[in-house]
Design a protein with these regions (language model features):
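Structural signal for interior beta-strand "rungs" in well-ordered beta-sheet cores
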Residues: 2-165, 169
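Terminal amphipathic alpha-helical/low-complexity segments used for targeting or macromolecular assembly
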Residues: 1, 5-6, 36, 42, ...
Length: 254
């Protein structure tokens, strides 16, 4: 373990093996860091939530997964709920200035670029990449292996495996991300067809997804994509219909 002498680590904080805490970082007593976590200068982990109703006496926590890197001036606030936990998964990379508000749940292998802002109760699925300066409304959900462009304004849910940009616009499947995760050609083809049917065959997207689930769904990935539509409280972002002759799934960017 390597702790800079100017770092502040409160009694009660739990640090795993081989953690590194750089100058002037603050780790409050409500925090548990997994093995190999690196906290860079000026980061504040486990601070009180920015909620005017919050009682500072509430016992709540932050949990950071093993191998995660928190760059300069990252803030991760503890939960507003007694016994609640704000979670950042394992092997994540949160770049400088990122804010993770109370009660968020960030999955494993997530990258949040500089100055990404997650409001309270936002969930981000594993293997998702978010570009710099993107901001997320409270209670929004982002599915696994999604990609959200820089400076995006997200107020609605973003399903798994898609790319999103601007103001709640889905612009196609995240084909590069799927390839990097080793998805087979058969699964990618099935996801393309599923994407097209849900977003471009007319009707309510939640109803379309439910109808498709009632059929024989071949892959766990497609089932996960469709099941995502049944949850949440913010509504689902809409897809931009810009056809591409190359991929035929609705985005010239793919």
């Amino acid at each position: 373990m390597n702790i800079h002498p100017t770092a502040i680590i409160e009694d009660g904080a739990q640090l795993g093996a081989d953690c590194v805490v750089h100058a002037h970082a603050v780790i409050t007593r409500y925090v548990r860091l997994g093995d190999g976590t690196v906290v860079h200068p000026g980061a504040v982990i486990g601070g009180d939530p920015q909620d005017l109703k919050f009682d500072p006496a509430t016992p709540s926590h932050v949990r950071i997964g093993a191998g995660t890197v928190l760059r300069e001036h990252v803030t991760v606030n503890r939960s507003t709920i007694a016994g609640g936990v704000t979670v950042v998964g394992a092997n994540c990379f949160l770049m400088a200035g990122t804010h993770v508000a109370h009660d968020c749940a960030v999955g494993d292998q997530v990258v949040l670029a500089n100055n990404v802002l997650l409001a309270g109760h936002v969930s981000v699925g594993a293997y998702t990449f978010v570009g710099g300066g993107a901001a997320f409304h409270q209670f929004t959900r982002v599915g696994e292996s999604a990609m959200v462009g820089g400076l995006a304004r997200i107020t609605l849910d973003i399903p798994p495996f898609v790319m999103a940009a601007e103001r709640d616009e889905i612009v196609g499947l995240n084909l590069v991300g799927l390839k990097r995760r080793g998805f087979s050609g058969e699964v990618v083809a099935e996801l393309k067809e599923c994407f097209r049917e849900v977003f471009f065959d007319g009707g309510n997207v939640r109803h379309r997804a439910q109808e498709m689930l009632a059929r024989s769904v071949q892959s766990a990935e497609v089932r996960g994509f469709l099941e995502f539509f049944a949850g949440g409280r913010r509504g689902i972002a809409r897809a931009r219909r810009v056809w591409s002759a190359e991929n035929e799934v609705g985005s010239a960017a793919l």
